[in-house]
Amino acid sequence: PLYSSAASDVYKRQIDGRIGFIGGMNIADRYVRGTQWGTWRDTHFRIEGSGAAGLQASFLSDWSATTKTHISGPEYYPPVGHFTDDILQIAPSGPFGKWRALLQADSYAIARARQRIWIQTPYYLPSEVLNTALQEAALAGIDVHLMLPARSDSKVVDLATHSYLDDMMKAGVKISFYKPGFLHSKLLIIDDMLSVIGSANMDFRSFEHNFEINAFVYDREFASRMAAIFEDDLTHCHTVTPGEWFTRPRTRRVAESLMRVFSPLL
């Protein structure tokens, strides 16, 4: 079909069931050549050990659902070595069933934050629950920082995304726009302990309609490394002030409000 409401945006790769890759990267020329307006910035990780088995299980589950062919056996789940003591959860999510695993997990993590919530996402079209949770965290004095591309691959999505930022900024959320190109990274850092990396954007489609997969890593050293990546990207950003944001043209704000209506479909 030309369009499906149950799209698959799962960016995971498997090698012999022993090594897995997870993050936002597609297999595409744009990662080498960039875009007309700059580089394509993404975050992707290699996983070895039991975490790779989790990716393998998710892949085989998707394969079974797609082809109606069940694949199992020890050859698909080879013995894996022990590499670190990091606690890692592989969390797939899809449009079937009552619960939305990634939305619930992110909302729970945000509600438990005490120091910082740092987010990188190419699109910000959140559910009301998630949007409110981030604003409440900022109002409680938590360092909430949202990093977005200055320009994404969709002008309509940019307009809809910006319609959510007024209330975020009023609540004290810091908003930075990545300037060198398209920021496609999907990263969530909670305090100095939890990092979330994967395929899911902060938007309706990822949480409600798409097949997605994220890795939840519970480790201080790893969180520190992710924070360093965030801070390095921040040197290539423009952090917007309220004075700048609230003086943008009225016609622009009207267009943003109109596009917001279509957020669940974008």
What are these regions (language model features)?
Residues 12, 18-20, 116, 143-145, ...:
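Beta-sheet entry/capping signal
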Residues 9-90, 94, 190, 196-266:
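Signature of lipid phosphatidyltransferase scaffolds
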Residues 94-104, 125-129, 156-157, 178-181:
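A general structural motif
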Residues 1-7, 11:
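Single conserved hydrophobic/aromatic residue that forms the stacking wall/gate
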Residues 93, 119-121, 148, 178, ...:
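Thr-Gly-centered strand-to-loop micro-motif
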Residues 108-174:
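Primarily the HKD phosphodiesterase
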Residues 154-202:
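C-terminal structural cap/anchor segments
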Residues 99-102, 133, 172, 184:
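Extended alpha-helical targeting/anchoring segments
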